[in-house]
Amino acid sequence: MPEGDTVWQAARRLHDALAGRVLTRSDFRVPRYATVDLTGRTVLDVTPRGKHLLTRVEGGLTVHSHLRMDGSWKVFAPGQRWSGGPAHQIRVILGTADRTAVGYRLPVLDILRTAEEQRAVGHLGPDLLGPDWDPERALDNLRADPPRALGEALLDQRNLAGIGNVYKSELCFLLGVTPWLPVGELPADRAARLPTLAKKLLEANRDRPVRRTTGLRGQDLFVYGRAPRPCLRCGTSVRVADQGDGSRERPTYWCPTCQAGPAPRPGGRTGVRPRR
């Protein structure tokens, strides 16, 4: 699952390549839009909204895409070899005189009227990297379902937009609670820190090629992807277990010593509350 900073970087690359330029190539390789031709139109801007990308073109149209797990946008110069995947994985090509943007494996690709963009993104909560960021509303959204596990609430883009699986695990570590802690049991002081901390992490990483949360040289992340290596703070083995149901199930990392709250037992059942 992409993080908000990843999508922000993709939007910036696309904006730098396309905005203000006339499209000389337009090729939508999905049946619904196979006959759509945007050539001759100027790209106005490319804007991220949470994990969604909105490419606006003159004439009041927006190309809406979402990367989800495997999608990507690549930008190529004339004559450069395309390296985003095999040709059958290409979903859309938008080209100008000096750059070509290619969307690979995009699970969501729509064309809508710019005036109706809310149909695609109106359900999203405050965007951590957007102009609509509202920490109080984000926290209110999270608190609206007290029994819900914090990790699942953080991934719900209706609460706040931009957190993916990496930041879910890292935020919970920095707050000192497990991702299975019910939102209603999050101590008030940590709840108050959460929105600001989340925004700080994404803003710090939106211009970096490698995501970092630790500030430690040679160690990029506190827990994500580190199981069963030692915790960077206490030396306890970092653990991993799946959180969520069905298609929403995600590998989730935590330190059983540094993080308080319920966590899966070795057999996978949630219920153990480690001491701090």
Curated annotation (Swiss-Prot):
Catalytic activity: 2'-deoxyribonucleotide-(2'-deoxyribose 5'-phosphate)-2'-deoxyribonucleotide-DNA = a 3'-end 2'-deoxyribonucleotide-(2,3-dehydro-2,3-deoxyribose 5'-phosphate)-DNA + a 5'-end 5'-phospho-2'-deoxyribonucleoside-DNA + H(+)
Enzyme Commission numbers on file: 3.2.2.-, 4.2.99.18
Cofactors: Zn(2+)
Keywords per UniProt: DNA damage, DNA repair, DNA-binding, Glycosidase, Hydrolase, Lyase, Metal-binding, Multifunctional enzyme, Zinc, Zinc-finger
Binding residues annotated for DNA, in chain numbering: N165
GO MF annotations, alphabetized: class I DNA-(apurinic or apyrimidinic site) endonuclease activity; damaged DNA binding; DNA-(apurinic or apyrimidinic site) endonuclease activity; oxidized pyrimidine nucleobase lesion DNA N-glycosylase activity; zinc ion binding
PANTHER family linked to this entry: ENDONUCLEASE 8
Function: Involved in base excision repair of DNA damaged by oxidation or by mutagenic agents. Acts as a DNA glycosylase that recognizes and removes damaged bases. Has AP (apurinic/apyrimidinic) lyase activity and introduces nicks in the DNA strand. Cleaves the DNA backbone by beta-delta elimination to generate a single-strand break at the site of the removed base with both 3'- and 5'-phosphates.
Family: Belongs to the FPG family.
Protein name per the record: Probable endonuclease 8 2
Species this chain originates from: Streptomyces coelicolor (strain ATCC BAA-471 / A3(2) / M145)
Taxonomic path: Bacteria, Bacillati, Actinomycetota, Actinomycetes, Kitasatosporales
